[in-house]
């Protein structure tokens, strides 16, 4: 998983609330078992509308999605995180996230940042006025910066550390590979091992 410390990029304003995981990536795209190749399914129902924000060339390089409240609600769908990452998003800003989506995002290298609705609206206004506006998400300082405006966000220390180290569940386990190997070596040879 790619490390996340400080990311500066442009942002796409998704002025919608109650975006569930089926809207993020419809079930028809869930037949793959790899973590890549899902960008084509991201918001596919909405991308049929030429006025949809991700169809606007001004936001084609956006790496931060700025969404309304209740983003990522609904069923547990890791594919929603994979589709957002495949599109190129590193962070999603929203006043509230679905709990399961938030957990999947943190494990999948996508930073979910909760900010007050007033902050989200200010960021929307700024990036709509100038789509090239740089937005900085600073995980080290736990801040979002746009121009002279700065907003702080909360994130538990363990999740922050994992993202900054670039550790998914497998990477975290592999940090203990020597201890696991020593444990397996101490067991009777007729017992199964993971090697």
Curated annotation (Swiss-Prot):
Protein's name in the database: 3-isopropylmalate dehydratase small subunit
Family matches, as InterPro entries: 3-IsopropMal_deHydase_ssu, Aconitase/3IPM_dehydase_swvl, AconitaseA/IPMdHydase_ssu_swvl, IPMI_Swivel, LeuD
PANTHER family: 3-ISOPROPYLMALATE DEHYDRATASE SMALL SUBUNIT, 3-ISOPROPYLMALATE DEHYDRATASE SMALL SUBUNIT 2-RELATED-RELATED
Keyword set includes Electron transport: no
The species this protein was found in: Salinispora arenicola (strain CNS-205)
Subunit structure: Heterodimer of LeuC and LeuD.
EC number annotated for this UniProt entry: 4.2.1.33
Pathway: Amino-acid biosynthesis; L-leucine biosynthesis; L-leucine from 3-methyl-2-oxobutanoate: step 2/4
Role: Catalyzes the isomerization between 2-isopropylmalate and 3-isopropylmalate, via the formation of 2-isopropylmaleate.
Molecular-function GO terms, alphabetical: 3-isopropylmalate dehydratase activity
Stored Gene3D superfamilies: Aconitase, domain 4
Family from the record: Belongs to the LeuD family. LeuD type 1 subfamily.
GO biological process: L-leucine biosynthetic process
Lineage, broadest ranks: Bacteria, Bacillati, Actinomycetota, Actinomycetes, Micromonosporales
GO cellular component, one term: 3-isopropylmalate dehydratase complex
Catalysis: reaction(s): (2R,3S)-3-isopropylmalate = (2S)-2-isopropylmalate
Enzymatic class: lyase
NCBIfam families: leuD, PRK01641.1
Keyword annotations: Amino-acid biosynthesis, Branched-chain amino acid biosynthesis, Leucine biosynthesis, Lyase
């Amino acid at each position: 998983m790619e490390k996340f410390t400080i990311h500066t990029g442009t942002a796409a304003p998704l002025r919608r609330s109650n975006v569930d995981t089926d809207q993020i990536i419809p079930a028809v795209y869930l037949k793959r078992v790899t973590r890549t190749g899902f960008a084509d399914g991201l918001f596919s129902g909405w991308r049929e509308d030429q006025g949809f924000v991700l169809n606007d060339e001004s936001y084609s390089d956006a790496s931060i999605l700025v969404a309304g409240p209740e983003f990522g609600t609904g069923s547990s769908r890791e594919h929603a995180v994979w589709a957002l990452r495949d599109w190129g998003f590193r962070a999603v800003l929203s006043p509230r996230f679905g709990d399961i989506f938030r957990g999947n995002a943190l494990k999948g290298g996508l930073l979910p940042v909760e900010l007050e609705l007033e902050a989200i609206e200010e960021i929307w206004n700024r990036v709509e006025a100038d789509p090239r506006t740089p937005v900085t998400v600073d995980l080290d300082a736990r801040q979002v910066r746009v121009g002279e405006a700065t907003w702080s966000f909360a994130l538990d220390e363990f999740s922050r550390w994992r993202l900054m180290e670039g550790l998914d569940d497998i990477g975290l386990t592999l940090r203990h590979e020597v201890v696991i190997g020593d444990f397996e070596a101490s067991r009777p040879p007729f017992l199964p091992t993971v090697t």
